[in-house]
């Protein structure tokens, strides 16, 4: 007996705003390649983020800073080919939007035209408002990113929780309202106190998607390699692992190696 595949409605920017209005939580995961994106999309995840975290998990860099715009477009193109339902948001990498609003718009246009992505994400508030304004005025949907902003790691010096002090918390709240006013369709809040994140989410009408921001926001995002247990070195408090693929994959590779060495693979049934 065959099991019918569950059908999911195509997600749009408006869908996310409607989900917040209806009290439905938003699920978001990263993906960087066709195969992973196909699985994530088929599982009914609402948003796929082609994150600059590819710099870490795909290329082995210590930070997100080295990844280029061309590399982001390559990953995004692979993801877009795979999806039938999820909204695809693509990170603008470090150096592609900070220096000049015109450059920011050019970078965003390249991502949209060359990858087929549905929206872009960039880090920061008031300091990048002109870049955000330029991109949105061109008709490109923008997701904001506040709190811990990994592209500013050398400014912070550490990946610690942000906005614990009153002054920084007030700036974060002000930036969130500014992003909403400018037309951003959603905001990622990373590693901020849960009560503050809840307050921000309740103060604006656009969705707030958290990573290490508690349960009072409108949705959650995780890096797919982390939640699948493919990485063992990264153990933040907010991370829940839903599988141990590192262990399962290691065992599978070892079994394959042993079967090759012992001439058990291929068997007679696996030959032409």
From Swiss-Prot:
Q: Organism's domain of life?
A: Bacteria
Transmembrane ranges, per UniProt, are none
Name its co-factor(s): Mg(2+)
**Subcellular location as annotated:** Cytoplasm
Amino acids binding Mg(2+): 52, 91, 123
Q: Which InterPro entries match?
A: Pantoate_hydroxy_MeTrfase (IPR003700), Pyrv/PenolPyrv_kinase-like_dom (IPR015813), Pyrv_kinase-like_dom_sf (IPR040442)
**SUPFAM superfamilies linked to this entry:** Phosphoenolpyruvate/pyruvate domain
Q: Where is the active site?
A: 190
Listed under subunit, the entry gives:
Homodecamer; pentamer of dimers.
* Physiological role: Catalyzes the reversible reaction in which hydroxymethyl group from 5,10-methylenetetrahydrofolate is transferred onto alpha-ketoisovalerate to form ketopantoate.
What NCBIfam families does the record tag this protein with?
panB, PRK00311.1
| Official protein name in the record | 3-methyl-2-oxobutanoate hydroxymethyltransferase
Species of origin:
Christiangramia forsetii (strain DSM 17595 / CGMCC 1.15422 / KT0803)
* Gene name per UniProt: panB
